[in-house]
Amino acid sequence: MEEEQPPAKKRNMGRSRKGCMKGKGGPENATCTFRGVRQRTWGKWVAEIREPNRGTRLWLGTFNTSVEAAMAYDEAAKKLYGHEAKLNLVHPQQQQQVVVNRNLSFSGHGSGSWAYNKKLDMVHGLDLGLGQASCSRGSCSERSSFLQEDDDHSHNRCSSSSGSNLCWLLPKQSDSQDQETVNATTSYGGEGGGGSTLTFSTNLKPKNLMSQNYGLYNGAWSRFLVGQEKKTEHDVSSSCGSSDNKESMLVPSCGGERMHRPELEERTGYLEMDDLLEIDDLGLLIGKNGDFKNWCCEEFQHPWNWF
């Protein structure tokens, strides 16, 4: 009988890879990680690349260093495979592109954070109605209030730029004086000059406006005595009138006769808490116009001395 021969070993038809070439070639061949690059036993480096859709290799040349061989492989890969080429090294153009992309991403992130900070500044810088605004015609300044008032009264809020701004301490008028009309006739110089009549109407606010919105004052805080003497005649040339009651209005005239304004009566009485907006810990009074006023007497500088 014929003896059975063992089956012949199949020849390795697989592709040669770097893993199967360990220990072969030059001393640095095993540590080289570049694609298509290998070292000869005498130390030279060679580069070769496979053609797309083919199994043949293209010889690229012999080089002194592995980096030069890797650069030759990258150039051939870009020509054969285009943008899908797998490169060994990052070339200066690609490196610059990567840096530009990183800068763009960083700048995009920075612009987002900058936009966020800008919104915060806008929020912190919101106009809460505490600023000053100067009138368009005249030498008066306007202090806005914490409360929104009717349109009929918003344009009449003017205070003296050089005065003491104590007009908000005036006693409240009776309900019968809800509306006051001041007629002023101004005449202009010249033979053909005529006169014009200006009418101003003021309406008092509701008596318990502050008490409806803020229940801050009760008990001993309800009333306190403030003596105030009012001059019968005072100069209103630098002011547009009192802040709330508008008892007098001055109409500028161009060389004509002076207008008649009603005189203020001397009043001494109680100052209602409705006229105040807030009393802080330092004894400062905040009026409806946003004015910060101190008490005229030292004994009333602090709230705990009011009892």
Curated annotation (Swiss-Prot):
Residues 1-27, 235-257 are annotated as: Disordered. Keywords: Activator, DNA-binding, Nucleus, Transcription, Transcription regulation. One of its GO terms (cellular component) is nucleus. The keyword Transcription applies. One of its GO terms (molecular function) is transcription cis-regulatory region binding. The keyword Transcription applies. Residues 8-21 have a biased composition (Basic residues). It is found in: Nucleus. SMART domains: AP2 (SM00380). It comes from the Eukaryota. CDD domains: AP2. Pfam families: AP2. Its main location: nucleus. InterPro entries: AP2/ERF_dom (IPR001471), AP2/ERF_dom_sf (IPR036955), DNA-bd_dom_sf (IPR016177). Belongs to the AP2/ERF transcription factor family. ERF subfamily. Transcriptional activator that binds specifically to the DNA sequence 5'-[AG]CCGAC-3'. This is Dehydration-responsive element-binding protein 2G. It comes from Arabidopsis thaliana (Mouse-ear cress). The gene is DREB2G.
